[in-house]
Amino acid sequence: MTSSKFAVCVLLLLLFSSAPAEANWWKVQTSGTDTNLRAVSAVYVPDAKANGAPVPVVWASGSNGVILKSVDEGKNWTRLHVTDGDSLDFRGIVAFSASTAYVMSIGDGDKSRIYKTADGGATWKLQYSGDRKEVFLDTIVCLSEKECMALGDPVERKFLLLKTTDGEQWNPLPTGNMPVALPGEGAFAASNSCLAMPDDKKVLFGTGGPAARVFQSNDGGLTWTVARTPVVQGNPSSGIFSLRIDAHDRVLVLGGDYKEPALSDRVAATSLDNGKTWQLAVKQPGGLRSGLALIDNGDWVAVGPSGEEVTEDYGAHWKHTDSLNLNAVELLDTQTGWAVGAHGLIARFVNRSKRIPGIARPR
C-alpha cells in the first residue's frame, strides 16, 4: 500500500505455508527459482510448427528482480533480467507475445517503475519511474500493447492512475473529479489484480485499509463514483486484494486480512448490478484470497496463501479444491491457465469440472 515497509510485511507474512503433496485443480511445475512470485500473464500465440495453431506463452514475475518466461506450456522456464533490476520487486506483468511484455515494480518513489521489452526480455526499456517519494504503484493492466493503465496509492489524497495510449509515454490521469481517499486507504500490490479495465471507458479498482471500496469510472477516468463493499476492512492489513468484472457487468471482489490469513469472514463479495449493491458470499473461501480469474459464465477460481476454491454460482458459494500457497492467477480459457505463489511456486490449471463447457472470456 503506502510504504515499502507495508509491502515487505505483506511479502513476509504470506510466506507462511508450503505446497502440499497433492493438488486437484492445479498441477505444480518446476520454476527454477525459490523467490516469491506475485504476477502471471499468459497469451496465445500462433505456432509456426503447427500450421499456426495457438500455443500459450506464459510470463511471471516477483521479488529479487525475477522475471520468468515459458514457451512450452510451463515445462521449462527462462530467467530474464532487467539491467540494475535485481533488487526490484516486480508485482505486475502483462504479456502480448513471446517478444513483448510490460513489467511493473513496486516501492516508494523511484522504486516504482514500468519497463517494456520488445525482444523477448533480452533488453528492457524504462518507461516510467516514480518522480516523488509518495508514488507507490500497485498494479498494471492493458487493453492492448498501446493502451494500458497503472494504479498507485494516493498522492495528495487522490489515487494515482497512469495511462499510456501509445505504448511508450505514461501520463497521470486528472483527479479533479475523483473522490478523495480516506486517511490510510490504499491498494494492495498482492497479485496485480486490484485494477480492471474491461474496455476503453470502464475502469474499476478496489481498495483496503479503513474501508474496502470500489472506485469506478465509465468515461475513461474523467469522472468517478465510489461504493463501499462488505469485505473485511478497518485495519491497514485488510480489504480488497483482487477485483474482476465479467461480460455482464457482474463484479467479484476477494480479499481478507494478511495479518490474519486464516480469517474467512467477509472475504468474498459480489455485485450483480455493476457495483451498485454488494452481497457477501453465502459460503466464503477458507481464508485470505489474493487472486481471482474467470473460468466461464458464473464460474470463477480463487487463489490464496492457504488454498484455492471455485464457484459455479457467481461467487455465492465457494468450494475448496486445493491447499497450495498461490498469490496470482490468470486463465486463458476453461482449460488453460497458470497461477504463481510463494517459494517460486508455479501451477498449471487443471479443470476438474464436468459441467463447464466453452471458452471463457476474461475481462
Question: What spans do the regions from the language model cover?
Answer:
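Bacterial N-terminal signal peptides that target proteins for export
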Residues: 1-8
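Bacterial N-terminal signal peptides
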Residues: 9-17
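Residue-level hotspots at or immediately adjacent to binding/recognition sites across diverse folds
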Residues: 22-363
